[in-house]
Amino acid sequence: MSKQTFTTTFAGKPLVVEVGQVAKQANGATVVRYGESTVLTAAVMSKKMATGDFFPLQVNYEEKMYAAGKFPGGFMKREGRPSTDATLTARLIDRPIRPMFAEGFRNEVQVINTVLSYDENASAPMAAMFGSSLALSISDIPFNGPIAGVQVGYIDGEFIINPDKEQMEASLLELTVAGSKEAINMVESGAKELSEDIMLEALLKGHQAIQELIAFQEQIVAVVGKEKAEVELLQVDADLQADIVAKYNAQLQKAVQVEEKKAREAATEAVKEMVKAEYEERYAEDENLATIMRDVAEILEQMEHAEVRRLITEDKIRPDGRKIDEIRPLDAVVDFLPKVHGSGLFTRGQTQALSVLTLAPMGETQIIDGLAPEYKKSFLHHYNFPQYSVGETGRYGAAGRREIGHGALGERALEQVLPSLEEFPYAIRLVAEVLESNGSSSQASICAGTLALMAGGVPIKAPVAGIAMGLISDGTNYTVLTDIQGLEDHFGDMDFKVAGTREGITALQMDIKIAGITPQILEEALAQAKKARFEILDVIEATIAEPRPELAPTAPKIDTIKIDVDKIKVVIGKGGETIDKIIAETGVKIDIDDEGNVSIYSSDQAAIDRTKEIIAGLVREAKVGEVYHAKVIRIEKFGAFVNLFDKTDALVHISEIAWTRTTNVSDVLEVGEDVDVKVIKIDEKGRVDASMKALIPRPPKPEKKEEKHD
């Protein structure tokens, strides 16, 4: 296929798609140019069905530093593991694409997005999402798209689609919404305490804008789209399914209704093992035993799936016996740990998170050097999910995509209520340790984070709580669930996380397993989430009503002084010699910004005070008219040099020593003598002249005798 180009304008910027020139061996490939951002997307599919029990979709978002005219950092000067932003963007693209493949599709699919040029005012992630959908849509991969996504901002009561960098910085909302022509299927948002009505309107505005992008994709597919390949879907043997359902459905139904998680898991596992043992023995000599046992496992999963959904939609019974809008039992604790700067333990049913606060000097901020201009990040929220939290063994190592994503969601929810750096000049790190999990652990980490911040004396604007909403839908009827647990998340159609204060929403995240959800479902879910959020805030505020007025004794204290910008080099010294000497003497940490703000951190107030004295002395300047208690340091024929303070000296000229004539300076002064002097002049080179006689009353002039005349 020869190169073909398609052009439109979207949100005020040119959107150009090129097909047929590059990556022609992929199943589908596009080059998307949005503004001056360029993203190459290639989609490929394996020829055979994978053996696992899940759909192996991999989406990558690769940031090439040359795209922004930068050299990669580090010794190797080569791109390494994806940045946090790249990982989050890959997840952002994966989530709306995944539901658009058929049930039972098991061929491995990879969608690789490579940023070739970067324009900070034209969203490369949105170009990559568009390119991912289009590459799949024009390929022979059986993808039920297209989908598209947009960013939505909110400034002065107006919604802005795909805002530029300056607009996003001024926006009260940072929303990414994706979906198909029919419905929304992915949401990711941070917001400055906006109401449910505004958030819902933003979602609908975003979905409206998506229609334009989907129509553009459909035009392109009509011209260059390939015929979809016929692939084998995972389908179980119908006779085998009927046999197992008839024999064991009643037993499995009973097991599913056991309320306690571990007991329920044991009961369902016992039924499954009994079924597997029977059929493994029955077909032991069959050459297709592996396929049969795979079908048995899939049938049992489908039976459990169907029963959980039936109980909720028909009987209005949840696996743990709760009502549809009921929250699990809550518990909140502060000061769980000694010595640390703040800690909070939050428990919701069988989900429990411990959050630990650490405060540090601003020098500890994280430097982010990606495609965007380098910046410093002063608030970090890290989320850890050890396998023991679900009673299992597993891999331990660096944080995976899920942990990075959950940490970022908590960070987005909490950063909206943090004080400004002017009010609270600290780097803040929260670490959430999930100790138990039965669903909604990311939201538990937000609640625990609020407790830790308030216990640690961080003056947040308001406490934040989070809740996860679920959905069971048969296409016609639906049920929205409050505070979903693991089983409801696994077998349900939606995981809709909502975090916020009493004033409004600070973060949203929605993932679904169906093609999309309607505005009515969104509105109902937001309303139920608000009610639940207020219930959780009641528990948090009963534990700790407001941030403590003081930091923990172990937290670094801070004091700030202002110096002239031209004195920064004096405090730092050649090669950092002066500031290193101060730190070595006092044991403090010192940060100096480009505007001359000097922040001094230490748990010892005396050390802070001593450091302030030293710095004040270093930057102190002599002023004309001021009097100093000086020390004579050198004597010359023409006068004496005196030290006013620290490294500032002055010349007392011989004529400025006394009102009477001084013949020899050494007759009047000696080295080491203390004298009071007044500064009388500072020249353009900074040289200081001082006077001793200016502090002495001038003697009266002698009266002239009258001459007698003869």
Curated annotation (Swiss-Prot):
The protein's role, per its UniProt record: Involved in mRNA degradation. Catalyzes the phosphorolysis of single-stranded polyribonucleotides processively in the 3'- to 5'-direction.
Cofactor: Mg(2+)
Subcellular location(s) of the protein: Cytoplasm
InterPro entries cross-referenced by the UniProt entry: ExoRNase_PH_dom1 (IPR001247), ExoRNase_PH_dom2 (IPR015847), ExoRNase_PH_dom2_sf (IPR036345), KH_dom (IPR004087), KH_dom_type_1 (IPR004088), KH_dom_type_1_sf (IPR036612), NA-bd_OB-fold (IPR012340), PNPase (IPR012162)
Biased composition (Basic and acidic residues): 700-710
Gene name for this UniProt entry: pnp
Chain spans, region Disordered: 691-710
Catalytic activity: RNA(n+1) + phosphate = RNA(n) + a ribonucleoside 5'-diphosphate
Protein's recorded name: Polyribonucleotide nucleotidyltransferase
Biological source species: Streptococcus pyogenes serotype M18 (strain MGAS8232)
NCBIfam families hit by this protein: polynuc_phos (TIGR03591), PRK11824.1 (NF008805)
Residues engaged in binding Mg(2+): 489, 495
Gene Ontology biological process terms in this record: mRNA catabolic process; RNA processing
Residues annotated as domain S1 motif: 625-693
